[in-house]
Amino acid sequence: MALPQISTADQAKLQLMQEMEIEMMSDLYNRMTNACHKKCIPPRYSESELGKGEMVCIDRCVAKYLDIHEKIGKKLTAMSMQDEELMKKMSS
């Protein structure tokens, strides 16, 4: 089965979307790392490795951050779909 051909314009859009996705994920990672580091690791530390409490804190922080990110993404998607439906109704 042959794959459908994509126009050059669609390829450019796809490339842009992929680049934006990478940039957004990189930004999420950086913000999450900074937030959890500030919350869980004291500014002055003497150990070269994380302590058990710090590891647990970071694990929970990352889990919460990703959970909230997912919930916000779902809510924004739902709102966007509602807006699209409203626009369709208004244009009919």
UniProtKB/Swiss-Prot annotation:
Q: InterPro entries, per this entry? A: Tim10-like, Tim10-like_dom_sf
Is Mitochondrion one of the keywords?
Answer: yes
UniProt-listed GO biological process terms: defense response to Gram-negative bacterium; negative regulation of innate immune response; protein insertion into mitochondrial inner membrane
Q: Name one GO cellular component term.
A: mitochondrial inner membrane
Q: Where is this motif: Twin CX3C motif?
A: 36-61
Cystine residue pairs? C36-C61, C40-C57
Reply yes or no: does the keyword Protein biosynthesis apply: no
Q: Which SUPFAM superfamilies match?
A: Tim10-like (SSF144122)
Q: Which UniProt keywords apply?
A: Chaperone, Disulfide bond, Membrane, Metal-binding, Mitochondrion, Mitochondrion inner membrane, Protein transport, Translocation, Transport, Zinc
| Membrane topology recorded in Swiss-Prot or TrEMBL | Peripheral membrane protein
Which molecular function terms from Gene Ontology are attached? metal ion binding
Protein localization: Mitochondrion inner membrane
Describe the function of this protein. Mitochondrial intermembrane chaperone that participates in the import and insertion of multi-pass transmembrane proteins into the mitochondrial inner membrane. May also be required for the transfer of beta-barrel precursors from the TOM complex to the sorting and assembly machinery (SAM complex) of the outer membrane. Acts as a chaperone-like protein that protects the hydrophobic precursors from aggregation and guide them through the mitochondrial intermembrane space.
UniProt remark on domains:
The twin CX3C motif contains 4 conserved Cys residues that form 2 disulfide bonds in the mitochondrial intermembrane space. However, during the transit of Tim10 from cytoplasm into mitochondrion, the Cys residues probably coordinate zinc, thereby preventing folding and allowing its transfer across mitochondrial outer membrane.
Would you identify the family this protein belongs to, as annotated? Belongs to the small Tim family.
What binding partners and quaternary form does the record give?
A: Heterohexamer; composed of 3 copies of Tim9 and 3 copies of Tim10, named soluble 70 kDa complex. The complex associates with the Tim22 component of the TIM22 complex. Interacts with multi-pass transmembrane proteins in transit.
- The protein in question is named Mitochondrial import inner membrane translocase subunit Tim10
Source organism of the structure: Drosophila melanogaster
